[in-house]
Amino acid sequence: MDLLDKVMGEMGSKPGSTAKKPATSASSTPRTNVWGTAKKPSSQQQPPKPLFTTPGSQQGSLGGRIPKREHTDRTGPDPKRKPLGGLSVPDSFNNFGTFRVQMNAWNLDISKMDERISRIMFRATLVHTDGRRFELSLGVSAFSGDVNRQQRRQAQCLLFRAWFKRNPELFKGMTDPAIAAYDAAETIYVGCSFFDVELTEHVCHLTEADFSPQEWKIVSLISRRSGSTFEIRIKTNPPIYTRGPNALTLENRSELTRIIEAITDQCLHNEKFLLYSSGTFPTKGGDIASPDEVTLIKSGFVKTTKIVDRDGVPDAIMTVDTTKSPFYKDTSLLKFFTAKMDQLTNSGGGPRGHNGGRERRDGGGNSRKYDDRRSPRDGEIDYDERTVSHYQRQFQDERISDGMLNTLKQSLKGLDCQPIHLKDSKANRSIMIDEIHTGTADSVTFEQKLPDGEMKLTSITEYYLQRYNYRLKFPHLPLVTSKRAKCYDFYPMELMSILPGQRIKQSHMTVDIQSYMTGKMSSLPDQHIKQSKLVLTEYLKLGDQPANRQMDAFRVSLKSIQPIVTNAHWLSPPDMKFANNQLYSLNPTRGVRFQTNGKFVMPARVKSVTIINYDKEFNRNVDMFAEGLAKHCSEQGMKFDSRPNSWKKVNLGSSDRRGTKVEIEEAIRNGVTIVFGIIAEKRPDMHDILKYFEEKLGQQTIQISSETADKFMRDHGGKQTIDNVIRKLNPKCGGTNFLIDVPESVGHRVVCNNSAEMRAKLYAKTQFIGFEMSHTGARTRFDIQKVMFDGDPTVVGVAYSLKHSAQLGGFSYFQESRLHKLTNLQEKMQICLNAYEQSSSYLPETVVVYRVGSGEGDYPQIVNEVNEMKLAARKKKHGYNPKFLVICTQRNSHIRVFPEHINERGKSMEQNVKSGTCVDVPGASHGYEEFILCCQTPLIGTVKPTKYTIIVNDCRWSKNEIMNVTYHLAFAHQVSYAPPAIPNVSYAAQNLAKRGHNNYKTHTKLVDMNDYSYRIKEKHEEIISSEEVDDILMRDFIETVSNDLNAMTINGRNFWA
């Protein structure tokens, strides 16, 4: 069995069906302080107290944190200062309980490393025979994409090894590259035992003779030209310290983290693994599912390391998390084309035949003189020729719509392919598809220069026949194009083969793929731990497996194969306040999903309702639905100014966009509170249209399926579904379902020492704001040559609380793609503050911001953003200076938290930690306080906690208060009466970012985006040749579209539900 099949194959199995319970035993040593107390180093340093332990071991570990890589910005907080939230006062909130948890993290022993590690700058330059030079570490613009990046990484590692072997005199005669760690970019790390010289510059040239034939085959892929050479330049940089007084400085600690990462990565830098920022995947094996004919789901892992401060001594933690990702299969492009067309037409394909049933060749008896090449795999065909012919006829007859072609174009864009007629070429001839062209091989012509120098108009079909002696079998299919600097190359699909190792982008995932990525292949905690351990030992070669040569050379080892174990807090949930001051208290021992008959605390008042029915089978039931809706809403206290028989009810076709817009515009003129859309499917295209017009025109809408609407007409059953609809409807109409309150006691346990004081301090005159980003694929740009905007912008979702923390408003806006800095903050903060002032009649004295982040590299940037927020507040009103609390939320952190002992046969809720589990990470060396919190209760799979980092704390709330407020806010989500993974403002901001992205996609379908492009180009015609024009056009384009699409956003209302 393949290793990844063994590691990840349990993901779909029954809990505990084949696995054995891991041997675990708790430490018998009593501990009063699990984290210990940080001390300054002294000449007579006592052995540090164990801050973590591992099951079955009493070995001391390290102090305390498991964050990601440190940022090197010197403007960050002093690592030795007192953490921002660390006030020496009694905790305001008491835990409901404490218990032991294990993490997906392991201790590394770095105490035996050389005290100094030399850093060598390694710069490889590709030199063509014509003198052109390309520095590989900077990347080559024409050499992008998943496949090319993997080839470049492997080639650079081979360049490093060849260079190392050419220069043994630099390493005290050593010829084994294992003594050095190369980061596959431009830095080499070597212990001072093997390298202790200072070089200003050392130059070496490598040619084909320095590599074996197999190595050169890989290296030559990045040159694309024969005769290329490589110039290697090195020089030394200041060393890095593994211990001593300089080891824990901000810059040294950051670089030491990179060293440990590079050392542990060395065994992965080969053809056996695909390394991406999102994870590492084996090239062979690890296939856990195949959603369709041309895609598969592969399992992999993510490894991160961190240097932490243990009583003044640097120590290391390694985190290993399992992951999965969809990939394209190694197939012909024609098979991919037919599979996508089958999905788009929902027909299951054209007429079926067998592989041998090919069409008769043109040319009759002369066919033997032509190359009978049939597929990318040396004569084997992987597509159905009759199906291809079927779609070719549909394309000829113009029965393939522009919408289908556009969807197909999006699926093909960015795909790396190998032209099979060039597969034997020594140079790398792979191409990246830019788009699908409506022209065919017969219709597209170009001027070809003949041997006698004359020019002749030649079709693509004629060219391949004359140049490659190949007659195209499907000359009437659309062509694919690949963009070069100043022109496009055209290729027939039948001559394209998809290269392996390419991930599928989120925007290209089908419903089936998304289903496999979420629920179907979820692993339980017991399986997750076993998988992580196997990755640790089998792939990373740690533990008792065969020696890891790089780890041995640097004298780095794993302290124990058992993961880190520590104490966790069990936080108490808030009270929920319904109508008539009715309080609903939760007992965490019974779960946090609450069922209550309490009426809405602030029921909405509805002026009128418009119902648009898109299901012709439901026409006769619309009146009954309206009566049932009014009845159930009235039971919750909602008021209607008009009777259901006076509501406007209209029947439209399931794809009538124009009619939908007309009805919504009329609803706005008539002051209608809400527009209902009843559709047969549960997730139709009309849903996106309704939500698009909701934000663009400014009218609240809600879409339900006919099945859901039918439940409103019954006397019995469907209560949960009805409740969910009404809970969503009430906030959209301006009401509030319930409020959250600070609890005094839970289950006869006092959980807050002074609830009235905490209520006044934490919630009165406090506004909570959430920022979320939705990034797309490649970076956006304005293509001047095509006069069009290429790519999708990043969408920022912003949610803000009003007078009460459970009352939310929000909006979204666009900015440059892949830009992680929040733009236009002063303007956006003004919107938030204005909404709070309008609902409360005063401005907030405290502003709490939950800002999404991806790691410690974001911290200095967030500090700068806070300064913009403060400037916006000062501009709001003279003398206005609210206190800011800014928390970075890292939802994609690879930290996991499990119970110390797991019942391997238990269900997901039994194997996971409970809602409210909080690991209090003590003051870390970077000076920011952190905690890890699990709010949700997973019904399947393994819970994914969120890491919170306190960046700014002007209001001086204690960490205990911040942890509890964060947990309480998760319960303020109004629709599902159970907490999601993050606070309500973050959850709402996340939904707003998704909604904004979907609205942009819908906008591109309904509006001719070229109109924007030409307007923007004409506006900046006078600077069209300047170097800054691309950025200027791109920013102007995004701002124009953002203002057009979001101008009528409904303020101060939960419209996105």
Swiss-Prot record:
Under the heading Gene3D superfamilies, the entry gives: 3.40.50.2300, paz domain, Ribonuclease H-like superfamily/Ribonuclease H
Q: What is its main location?
A: cytoplasm
Any one GO MF term held by the record is:
single-stranded RNA binding
- Basic and acidic residues: compositionally biased ranges: 67-81, 356-388
Ranges of Low complexity composition bias in the record = 17-30
Q: Where is this region: Disordered?
A: 1-89, 344-388
A single Pfam family it belongs to is Piwi
Q: Which GO terms describe its cellular component?
A: cytoplasm; cytoplasmic ribonucleoprotein granule; nucleus; RISC complex; RNAi effector complex
InterPro entries of this UniProt entry?
HRDE1/NRDE-3-like_N, PAZ_dom, PAZ_dom_sf, Piwi, RNaseH-like_sf, RNaseH_sf
Q: Where does the record place the Piwi domain?
A: 677-1001
Task: Please state where this protein is localized.
Answer: Cytoplasm; Nucleus
Q: Which UniProt keywords apply?
A: Cytoplasm, Nucleus, RNA-mediated gene silencing
Q: Which residues form the PAZ domain?
A: 387-500
Query: What's one GO BP annotation on this UniProt entry?
Result: regulatory ncRNA-mediated post-transcriptional gene silencing
Function of this protein? Transports small interfering RNAs (siRNAs) from the cytoplasm to the nucleus. Required for RNA interference (RNAi) in nuclei. Required for exogenous RNAi-induced H3K27 methylation.
Write the protein's name: Nuclear RNAi defective-3 protein
Gene transcribed to yield this protein: nrde-3
